[in-house]
Design a protein with these regions (language model features):
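Sensory coupling linkers of modular signal transduction proteins
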Residues: 139-225
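Short, low-complexity intrinsically disordered segments enriched in small and basic residues
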Residues: 3-6
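Acidic, low-complexity, intrinsically disordered peripheral segments
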Residues: 462-480
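Charged heptad-repeat coiled-coil "rod" segments that mediate homo-/hetero-oligomerization
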Residues: 200-306
Length: 480
């Protein structure tokens, strides 16, 4: 486990009192602190969260701990009595940037969940790393569920970013800015820097992070159910809920793949229309030599292509909206899966070591939070269905419009090949033939993808809500 090591106080730990340092030593301290964070943030001795461990804590609106499970107590090395009524930052690691927590509170205060890699500190001074999800509770307060970090390679990029952010925050504190200002600047720094890893902002990171992490973590998760005793009905219903969530997740993964393919084909359509416009440029070179029967079809095809371009641009926007709604649904499902695993693990914990009414209340809290997520999933699914219908209609319109200029170009080539060109123009004929072949393949691909859109079943999460009502009813029986 390791022994707590004495650490020299740095600027942050002394509360930011500038008068304790002269300018030179402060600058040196900040540089060394930043370097320490960047180099050692992944190499320090630490507590390891087990591959199937999952733990939770509940706080009030001010972040004071009101409940937890035994796994949290074990990993944090705090007794339950020490955790209860303590601020949640009792486990805060000073290496974590204030900007990360500013992002968290901004999300929570707007009613949104928050997902992040977090480096906490146990009572003995050693860190432990987790994937943390925090969600607002319907009756007030927050639920945080944590698992181990399942993708250390991706996490290393975030740890490095945290180190950079803390270094920047220390500099700002040294310049006399207060902690609130510093955290706000740190949050913006994180939001901006995630673009280095291909993300739009930190919300974009969250939409990727949770489905990605939970899919890896679940490979080691326990699917054991409580077969006997008063908790058996609860455990059975939770197990059925987990199966239903897996089916939902599989459907959304397939839909996400299809949406990505559609977006790719949409880009191909845009490229095809650009090539059709290039044919007009090539035809203009021969404008004085082509007969009207040779020039007019190409000019009309290009003119129609410009109209199709507007439809294709709109299609791309709708496909992006569809992908966004799919990502929201996938993220919501992933959050529900995390909370379901947490509930299942806690039911097993209660079955092994019952602690009376207190743990029944905890189960009610977990069930209520999970119900909120599934209800949110229903709203996201409704938006997803709307976006899907719009994409289908726009795809059908684009396909219908593409056929007209495509047919005109095909007729032009057929006529030239049958009756011969009025002038020798092999480059133009070759370009037209190549575009016909390319666009035909693209249209076939688009028709195939359009057909697949209707094969992916879209369902309401009603069955999941029914299962949760069963869980809630069984939990209430335990209070009798």
């Amino acid at each position: 486990m390791g022994v707590r090591r004495a650490k020299p106080k740095n600027f942050f730990e002394t509360g930011g009192k500038v008068n304790e340092f002269n300018g030179c030593s402060l600058l040196l301290s900040n540089r060394l602190t930043t370097r320490y964070r960047k180099i050692n943030i992944m190499t320090e001795q630490q507590h390891i969260v087990g591959p199937d461990q999952i733990f939770f804590s509940v706080t009030d609106d001010k972040g004071v701990i009101t409940d937890s499970n035994s796994v949290f107590e074990s990993i944090s090395h705090y007794l339950r009595e020490e955790l209860l009524d303590s601020p949640h930052n009792i486990i805060r690691n000073p290496e974590m940037p204030g900007g990360a927590f500013r992002l968290m509170w901004d999300a929570l205060e707007s009613g949104k969940p928050f997902i992040a890699y977090v480096r906490n500190m146990a009572k003995d001074g050693l860190p432990y790393e987790v994937l943390s999800t925090v969600t607002p509770l319907e009756g007030g307060g927050y639920l945080s569920v944590r698992t181990r970090v399942s993708d250390p390679e991706f996490a290393s990029k975030i740890w490095w970013l945290y180190g950079e952010t803390r270094g920047k925050e220390d500099e700002l504190l040294g310049e006399g800015k207060n902690r609130r200002e510093t955290a706000e600047i740190g949050a913006q720094f994180i939001n901006d820097k995630v673009s280095d890893h291909g993300f739009v902002d930190y919300e974009d990171v969250q939409r990727f992070l949770l489905p990605h992490e939970i899919s890896i973590w679940e490979k080691n998760a326990s699917n054991e159910v409580v077969a006997e005793g008063r908790l058996a009905p609860v455990s059975k219903a939770v197990g059925e809920l987990r199966t239903e969530e897996e089916n939902w997740s599989d459907r959304q993964d397939a839909m996400a793949e299809l949406a990505a393919q559609l977006t790719s084909v949409g880009a191909k359509i845009q490229a095809s229309l650009a090539r059709t416009a290039d044919l007009k440029t090539q035809a203009d070179v021969w404008s004085g030599k082509l007969t009207p029967m040779e020039a007019i079809p190409l000019n009309v095809a290009v003119s129609l292509g410009s109209i199709v371009t507007e439809y294709v641009d709109d299609l791309q926007k709708r496909l992006q909206a569809l992908r966004g709604s799919i990502e929201h649904v996938r993220s919501t499902i992933a959050l529900a899966r995390v909370q379901t695993h947490c509930l299942a693990a806690f039911v097993r914990e209660v079955a092994e070591d019952s602690a009376g009414g207190r743990k029944v209340v905890s189960m009610k809290t977990l069930t209520s939070a999970l119900t909120t997520e599934v209800e949110a999933m229903g709203k996201n699914v409704a938006q997803y269905g709307t976006n899907l219908s719009r994409c289908e209609r726009r795809l059908q319109a684009v396909l219908s419009l593409i056929e007209i200029p495509q047919q005109m170009i095909m007729d032009w080539l057929k006529s030239v090949q049958e009756f011969g060109p009025s002038v020798d123009m092999p480059e133009l004929i070759s370009a037209v033939a190549g575009e016909i072949e390319s666009s035909a393949s693209m249209v076939d691909e688009l028709n195939g993808l359009l057909g697949r859109l209707g094969t992916i079943e879209q369902k309401s999460p009603r069955h999941m809500l029914d299962l949760l009502h069963t869980v809630d009813a069984e939990v209430r029986k335990l209070q009798v």
